[in-house]
Amino acid sequence: MDDRKLAFFTAIEDQGGVIVKGRTRFERLFHIGRSSVPLCVDALKAAVQEAKAGSDILRYQMAVNSLFQAAPNEPEALLDKAWMESKEKENRDTTAHLQAELQGYKNNLIKESIRMGNEDLGKHFEAIGDVEAAMDSFWKMRTEVSSTEQLVDLGKLLVRVAIERRDWKSIGNHLKPLNSVNDSDPKAKALKTYSKIANGIAALGQERYKEAAFCFVEASSGVPPEIYNQIASPNDVAIYGGLLALATMDRHELQANLLDNDSFREFLQREPHIRRAITQFVNGRYAACIEILESYRPDYLLDIYLQKHVPKLYADIRTKSIVQYLKPFSCVRLDTMQKAFNGPGPSIEDELFTMIKDGKLNARIDAINKSKALQTLENYEKQALDRIRRMNIMAADLEVKGSRKPGGMNDIPFSMTTDDTVSLA
């Protein structure tokens, strides 16, 4: 792997932001390696390196096996069995030691030591990949908690494991201690931002997109990224918040909650293309907004939280754009919409038909009288030109002899339209 790619995948700081830390780093690298052909080998090699820096043997095996399938000749594609045996013994010894230590605390009824013993054991289980045992150990800490700070720390531990387990529904309950912190507490702002981001990820996982959007846009950019970088990065907040808002908010909401939101605008500075897309939508340049987003679709398909939602979010944004585009008009030509939203390629007519059928667009497509409408317009244009010529002749004190032909300008109906049209109800 060259130095540039190594920096991209493994550096702590990149593009002016703090990249996520903890177990989610491996998740993201491994996901990219399994999802992208161009980045496959480099991402999997970085995942192997990340796994080997920790204690999770199963993750190491998964990364090496995937790399072997993609690039069997790479040195990292061969299992380091000596490391695996050594790490397995180390993990086993550590587990036995921590369990014995905890049992001693229980025998001596030392409440604070029991809490810390469960925490140490839970973190150890988390590090070696036994997230169920980790959750169990953290859960046992509840009875020994004696302060608000300890309750908050426990909530963050439970949230971290719940996110890894994709147990979205439990996250809200685990965050209650963070949300109940008094605003006068110096840590309140940081804790509430952590809570907003975690709640946003959980709502996204449950397809509650508008709720998730508000969670992300209400996060404070003044909070150091180190507070929440085990679950997300500032760049994630900008992307998730921006995309979800575009899919669920109208133009006024986008302006008020994102562009006029000083705190969220700081997040958007890290992902300027998202800010441009939002600005284009708010200004009514919907096709430009969609074009920007489409150019970044491959990147979002590599995100561990966004990937499965990208098709739905993009479809919702496109539907919203079409509806907003049609709003000022009572009638629009299909070829005009084709140029605005599709360009060369399949007709937009089928898409509009589906939107009308699903009740997303209150309109109808007039494709029956198009020939008559086209002929009528041609007649109208011809008669209009004749009338202009006649007015010019009269203004020049000239005279045109001849009878008035039937079907003059006053006989032309003004309500006819050209080609296939969309008529808005």
Curated annotation (Swiss-Prot):
InterPro entries: PCI_dom (IPR000717), Rpn7/CSN1 (IPR019585), Rpn7_N (IPR045135), WH_DNA-bd_sf (IPR036390). It is found in: Cytoplasm; Nucleus. Its main location: cytoplasm. Belongs to the CSN1 family. Component of the COP9 signalosome (CSN) complex that acts as an regulator of the ubiquitin (Ubl) conjugation pathway by mediating the deneddylation of the cullin subunit of SCF-type E3 ubiquitin-protein ligase complexes. The CSN complex is involved in the regulation of the circadian clock through its control of the stability of the SCF(FWD-1) complex. The keyword Flavoprotein does not apply. The keyword Cytoplasm applies. SMART domains: PINT. It comes from Neurospora crassa (strain ATCC 24698 / 74-OR23-1A / CBS 708.71 / DSM 1257 / FGSC 987). Component of the COP9 signalosome (CSN) complex. One of its GO terms (cellular component) is cytoplasm. This is COP9 signalosome complex subunit 1. Residues 219-379 form the PCI domain. Keywords: Cytoplasm, Nucleus, Signalosome. Pfam families: PCI (PF01399), RPN7 (PF10602).
